[in-house]
Amino acid sequence: MNTSHYSVLGHTVPYPKVYDPSLLFPISRAVGRTQIGIGVVLPFVGEDRWHAYELSWLDARGKPCVATATFHVPCDSPYLIESKSLKLYLNSFSAEVFNRAEALRLRIAADLSACAGAAVAVEFGLPPVGSGDKEISLDRLNVDIEDYGPPNPDYLSNVAQNLVEEMVEETLTSTLFKSNCPVTGQPDWASVTVRYFGMPIDHEGLLRYFISFRHHAEFHEQCVERIFQDVLQRCAPQCLAVEARYTRRGGLDINPLRTTSEMAWPLSVFRDPRQ
């Protein structure tokens, strides 16, 4: 079984000079999911949306071409794609000749699909930078914080029933999220958004919960699935979507999305301003 311990992550490796799809390194999703009580039947749908900013190849006359791209890895794929291996793989196209950009797109889609074990959609270009119209920022809350890890779901609760009578639909967001790479210890910064329909979730508790990831070491995708599970179990919304938009590293950023319903997908069609 592939694990991060055997990947290039955390190691100094030479940058490839020729195209090499074997650089891509899959990591089993099942390992991280078992730790948070997720079995074969997933409680969510969604994707890991990657934005690639450093993609270059040669045209038929040897002239360099550059582009950006978006990759959509389905969350029900058996494997996630390790980030440094993806960076090195994309760099390996820098001296590869393609007569048409479409041929490159198809090659990348085939290679990423083989690595993930499921069909990965690839398109050139990136979403625009922006934010949702009705997002409520939790960063404005005036709270004292003392707990920075491990993640503490005890902070999650609904507003007391004697204070509310009706279900609500809210989109709650925070730019204060930080977790850490489990291999290198490098900080991973993100904006996290929770959209739900149900009894009101306590805003201060949700912010405290987010900040309790600050010393936690876990892959991006697993952090989002942990948040989804904890909010679903502690607050019992009828519908739930969780998305994290991580800042760029190595010419890539990742945006995992997990939702109870494809009706809420995608949660956002924007990139975060910090991306």
Curated annotation (Swiss-Prot):
Its EC number is 1.7.1.13. Homodimer. The keyword Ligase does not apply. GO terms for biological process: queuosine biosynthetic process; tRNA modification. Keywords: Cytoplasm, NADP, Oxidoreductase, Queuosine biosynthesis. This is NADPH-dependent 7-cyano-7-deazaguanine reductase. Catalyzes the NADPH-dependent reduction of 7-cyano-7-deazaguanine (preQ0) to 7-aminomethyl-7-deazaguanine (preQ1). Pathway: tRNA modification; tRNA-queuosine biosynthesis. Substrate binds at residues 81-83, 220-221. NADPH binds at residues 83-84, 249-250. Belongs to the GTP cyclohydrolase I family. QueF type 2 subfamily. It is found in: Cytoplasm. GO terms for molecular function: preQ1 synthase activity. The active site is at residues 181, 188. It comes from Xylella fastidiosa (strain Temecula1 / ATCC 700964). The gene is queF. One of its GO terms (cellular component) is cytoplasm. It catalyses: 7-aminomethyl-7-carbaguanine + 2 NADP(+) = 7-cyano-7-deazaguanine + 2 NADPH + 3 H(+). SUPFAM superfamilies: Tetrahydrobiopterin biosynthesis enzymes-like (SSF55620).
